[in-house]
């Protein structure tokens, strides 16, 4: 059974050798990238966006699924350590861009498309976070 990490169904520690697969729920457009940088980045930071884009780029466009990878390789690509990855992954989970599922030492990262600008500004949490980070 796969457990949803974001819902707190399981406590876990990420290890460098843990394997993961990425599932992308939809293909990204140039508009999505603009929304990520203009609306989400001020809230979660550029490193979280870089992690999202790096994970997205590991997915095959025709299947919306990646091959099995390990965290050590991913962290080498990103040039960060596991603690920094975990902190920024949690930011991505907090704004609904990623969900993490775990079974034993295997993870699945599910990537979600960013909300369009209209939906973003109608989301009370995201709208408030953006306002608090950018001001008026």
Residue spans of the language-model regions?
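Alpha-helical propensity feature that highlights long, continuous alpha-helices across diverse contexts
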Residues: 4, 23, 102-113
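Winged helix-turn-helix DNA-binding recognition segment
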Residues: 58-109
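General N-terminal targeting signals
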Residues: 53, 61, 86, 102, ...
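Non-catalytic, interaction-prone regions of core transcription and DNA-replication machinery
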Residues: 35, 102-103, 124, 132
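Intrinsically disordered, low-complexity segments enriched in small/polar residues
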Residues: 10, 38, 50, 107-110, ...
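Short, amphipathic alpha-helical interaction segments positioned at domain boundaries
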Residues: 113-136
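Short recognition helix of helix-turn-helix/winged-helix DNA-binding domains
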Residues: 1-64, 69
């Amino acid at each position: 059974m796969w457990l949803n990490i974001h819902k707190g169904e399981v406590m876990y520690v990420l290890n460098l050798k843990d394997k993961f697969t990425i599932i992308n729920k939809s293909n990204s457009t140039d508009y999505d990238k603009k929304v990520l940088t203009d609306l989400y980045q001020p809230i979660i930071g550029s490193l979280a966006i870089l992690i999202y884009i790096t994970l997205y780029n590991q997915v095959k466009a025709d299947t919306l699924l990646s091959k099995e990878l390990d965290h050590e390789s991913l962290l080498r690509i990103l040039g960060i350590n596991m603690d920094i990855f975990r902190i920024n992954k949690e930011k991505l989970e907090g704004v609904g861009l990623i969900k993490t599922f775990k079974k034993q030492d295997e993870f699945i990262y599910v990537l979600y498309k960013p909300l369009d600008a209209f939906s973003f500004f109608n989301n009370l949490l995201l709208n408030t976070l953006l306002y608090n980070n950018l001001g008026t």
